[in-house]
Amino acid sequence: MAQAMLLMMPGVSTTNTIDLKRNALLKLQIQKIKPKSSTSNLFFSPLPSSSSSSSTVFKTLALFKSKAKAPKKVEKPKLKVEDGLFGTSGGIGFTKENELFVGRVAMIGFAASLLGEGITGKGILSQLNLETGIPIYEAEPLLLFFILFTLLGAIGALGDRGRFVDEPTTGLEKAVIPPGKDVRSALGLKTKGPLFGFTKSNELFVGRLAQLGFAFSLIGEIITGKGALAQLNIETGVPINEIEPLVLLNVVFFFIAAINPGTGKFITDDEEED
C-alpha cells in the first residue's frame, strides 16, 4: 500500500524510490564489511600529523662503539753515524766492520812487535829497518801517515756507520751443550762458535786499544829511540825481565783476540730493523 501510494504521488518519481533502495542496501553492506572499533584501532591507526611528528624526538642508540683511531707512527730519523767523535756521516766510507778488521790487524801487529822486541831487544822501527834495510828517515812520511790513520781510526773520526747486534742467546740449542768427543767438549766448552764470550763489540774495543798502543809506541820510539818495552821500563822503572810473564800474557791475549771470531752480526744503516 505504501509503495502504491508513493507511486501515485505526483511529486515522487520511480527513479527516486529505486535510489533509496540502493542506498539502504549499500549502507547494510558497508556495515557488514566495516570492522569493529577495537580492531580498527590496532590495524588502521591513523598517521601522525605534522604537528605531532615535529614534537616527538627520536633518540638513536649505537649498539657497537666506534673504533678508536690508531696513533700515527712517528718515524725517527736514521743517524748515519753511531758514535763518531767528529760526527762525520760516513767519512771515507769507513764502517764498523772495516774498523774491526783494522783493529784485528793492529792487535796482531802490536803483539808481534812486543814479541820481536822481547827477542831482539829493538823496537818496531828498528825491526822494520832490520827486515827491509830502509833507513827510518826515508820512511818518515809513511810512518806519519800510518800514525795519523791509526789514531783517527781508533777514536772513530773516519766515520763508523752501522753497528753490531748481539745474537739471541735464547732457545734449547743455545742453553744445552751438545755432546762431543773433542777437547773443548770434554772441558765443558762449546764445540762450535767462539771459545770465549767475546762479542764483536768487545773485539772492536780491544782493537781500538791496540791501535792506540801501536800508534803511541811508534811516537815514543821516534822521540826516544826505544821500543814499547823499553819505554815501559823508563816510565815505571821495573826491569823487563821481571814483567816477562805479564808481557807474554799480553801477547797471547792479543793473538787470541785477533783470530777468535766474536759473536754478533753487523747491521748497516740501510738494514736497520723496522
Curated annotation (Swiss-Prot):
Superkingdom in the source lineage: Eukaryota
Keyword hit for Membrane: yes
Transit peptide boundaries: 1-69
InterPro entries: Chloroa_b-bind (IPR022796)
Pfam families with a match to the protein in the record: Chloroa_b-bind (PF00504)
Positions of transmembrane segments: 105-125, 139-159, 204-224, 239-259
GO cellular component, as recorded: chloroplast thylakoid membrane; photosystem II
Cell location: Plastid, Chloroplast thylakoid membrane
Reported modifications of this chain: The N-terminus is blocked.
Signal peptide: none
Residue windows of the Sequence repeats: 64-167, 168-273
Membrane association type: Multi-pass membrane protein
Residues forming coiled coils: none
GO BP annotations, alphabetical order: photosynthesis
Record key words, sorted: Chloroplast, Membrane, Photosynthesis, Photosystem II, Plastid, Repeat, Thylakoid, Transit peptide, Transmembrane, Transmembrane helix
GO MF annotations, alphabetized: identical protein binding; phosphoprotein binding
Family: Belongs to the ELIP/psbS family.
Task performed by this protein: Seems to be involved in non-photochemical quenching, a process maintains the balance between dissipation and utilization of light energy to minimize generation of oxidizing molecules, thereby protecting the plant against photo-oxidative damage.
Protein name: Photosystem II 22 kDa protein, chloroplastic
